[in-house]
Amino acid sequence: MLTGSIVALVTPMDKTGEIDFLTLKQLVEFHIKSGTAAIVAVGTSGESATLDVDTHAKVVIKALEFADGRIPIIAGNGANSTSEAVLLSKRFADSGIIAGLNVTPYYNKPTQEGLFQHFKAIAESCDLPQILYNVPGRTSVDMLPETVARLSKIKNIIGIKEATGDLNRLADIKALVADDFALYSGDDATGCDFLLQGGHGVISVTTNIAPVEMAKMCEYALSGQADLAKKIDNQLAPVHKYLFIESNPIPVKWACAEMGLLPSADCRLPLMMLDKKYQPIVRNALIEAKLIS
C-alpha cells in the first residue's frame, strides 16, 4: 500500500493558459529529491476541470515520462460524466500509472446509488486501480461511509481520498472497510490527526511548497511519533489555512511562484491569479511556516 505524503501537483501554465512542460519536469524532479511518496497529476490542484481530455491525458503521461519510474504517478481521472471518466481510465491503463483518482461527480449531484454505479462502471472498465475522492465542499455531493464500504468490495477500488476534514468520518469508514483499503486525507489542516488516527497518507496541497516537511510529518505520524509529527504540523499550520484563502489552486500557485517553483502563478479561466489583497497574507504564512525569509 502506498503511504505518506502524496502531492496534489499544480499544473504549470503560461499567461495564455498553455501548459509549461519544462516547469512540470522541474516540479517532478523537485518532488523526487524532496522525498514525496507519489504525485497526483491533474487532480483538483492541477486544474482538471479546465483541461480538455487530450490535454489532461498529455499532462499525466508527460509527468509519468518525467518521473521515469522514480516516483509513482497517480492520474486525476475523475469527471462528472461517467463516460468521460471511463475514457480517461482506459487511456491510463497499462501506461505505468499506478492508480486513478476519481472525484465524486460535481454539479449534477447524483444519489448514493448513482455514485455507486458511477464508480463501479469506472472500476469495471479496465484494470487500472481506482482511488475514490470525496470532497463535498467542491462537488455539493457527499459520498457516505456506507457507499464507500459497498465500493470497497469491488476489486479495482483500492482506497479513498476523504476531504471532508471530519475525523469522525475516518472512524466511520475505517469501521466498514478491510484493513488493506487505503485511507488518504484530502484536508491538510487535519491531515496529521488523520494519520495519527489510523489513516495511511495525505494527498496534499501543502506538499507543493513544503515537500520535505510534509514527508517528515507523515513519517513521524505513521510511526506513532505524535509529538514530532505535531511539531511540524504546527509549523505548517499557517499555510494549511491560507492556501485556501481563495479557491484551490489559486493561492498555492501564487505561493509556488513566490518561492521560485513556478515562473508564473497563472491559472486557466475562470480561475484568476490570487487577489492582490490576499498576497501579503499568503506571503506572511510562508514566512511563519519558515518556508521563506
Swiss-Prot record:
List locations, semicolon-separated.
Cytoplasm
GO terms (BP aspect): diaminopimelate biosynthetic process; lysine biosynthetic process via diaminopimelate
Catalytic-site annotation from UniProt: 133, 161
Which residues does the UniProt site feature Part of a proton relay during catalysis point to? 44, 107
Q: Which InterPro entries match?
A: Aldolase_TIM (IPR013785), DapA (IPR005263), DapA-like (IPR002220), Schiff_base-form_aldolases_AS (IPR020625)
Q: Which residues does pyruvate bind?
A: 45, 203
Q: Which reaction does it catalyse?
A: L-aspartate 4-semialdehyde + pyruvate = (2S,4S)-4-hydroxy-2,3,4,5-tetrahydrodipicolinate + H2O + H(+)
> Subunit composition?
Homotetramer; dimer of dimers.
Question: What HAMAP family does the entry give?
Answer: DapA
Task: Name it.
Answer: 4-hydroxy-tetrahydrodipicolinate synthase
Q: Which organism is it from?
A: Psychromonas ingrahamii (strain DSM 17664 / CCUG 51855 / 37)
